[in-house]
Structures are given as structure tokens and as C-alpha cells.
Amino acid sequence: MKKIVLFLAMASLFSCKQSEEKMISTKETSSENEKIAKELFVHFNKHDWQKMANLYTENPEFKEPTSGMKPQLKSRAQIVKEYREMQSMFPDVQNSVVAVYPSGKNKVIVEFVSKGTNPDKTKFELPICTIFTIENGKITKDFSYFDNSQN
């Protein structure tokens, strides 16, 4: 009987230690993923599209209202091209991060406001929420949600 109690105590202690290690590992990963998401916005606001694109895997998956929320794979070259085109339309575009919410092991949700000047010289402010999936230090998915019907 003593052996069984001792075994159960050891098993319980071992499983608690594993859970604690897993929690620490998840927190470290979450913190690193938050840094990557925040770094993306630094490069965005500097209009350094190549550095921004380098935060993604070779062919990450994107979803956004402008594509009808249909998943699309894009190369880094496509990302750079699309953001350069956007910059030519909105040369002063900037994103202001409102909040960053880590979610689980590999997701980071970023709430932000995109601001700039339309080609007709009117100002716009567009609230956006993006869910980033980050694996092995690179963004694999970028799902953005916004309503630009008022802009």
C-alpha cells in the first residue's frame, strides 16, 4: 500500500512539473510571437516592405474582406508589391496599434487603426483586427477583419 501511495505521489509531482514546464514554454513562445507581431508594425510604419515581408514564411496564407475572405497564398515578393502599390495610393499610411492579445501557443491578435490620406485628399481611419498565426518564428497566416464601406 505504501508503494502505491508513494508511486501516486511521485506521478502527481512529475505531471505537475511537466505542466509547469509546458506553461513556461508556452509563455516564452507567446512573448516571442508578440514581438514578431509588433515588429511587423514597426516595419509597416517605416514603409520597409521587404523587412516586413521577411517576417512571413515563403508563402503565407492571407484572408481579408477585399478578397472576399477567401484564403490566398502570397509570396514575399507579392507582399512587397501589394504594399508598395498601397503606399503609392496612400503615401502617408500609418498603423496605430491599440492592443495586442496573445492567444494560445501560436496566435497573436492585434487591434489597430490604419490612418492616412485618400487620393482625393480626405483623411481616413480604418479600425482593423488581424489574427496572426506564427510558427517557428515566422508568420504563416494573416487574417484581417475590417469594414471599409465608410472610407
Model-derived features: positions:
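Short, low-complexity N-terminal intrinsically disordered segments enriched in polar/charged residues
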Residues: 16-50, 54, 58
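A solvent-exposed, acidic/Ser-Thr-rich amphipathic alpha-helical stretch
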Residues: 53-103
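Sec-dependent N-terminal signal peptides
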Residues: 4-13
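Short, surface-exposed coil-to-beta transition loops
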Residues: 94-96, 124-130
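A short hydrophobic beta-strand element
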Residues: 106-114
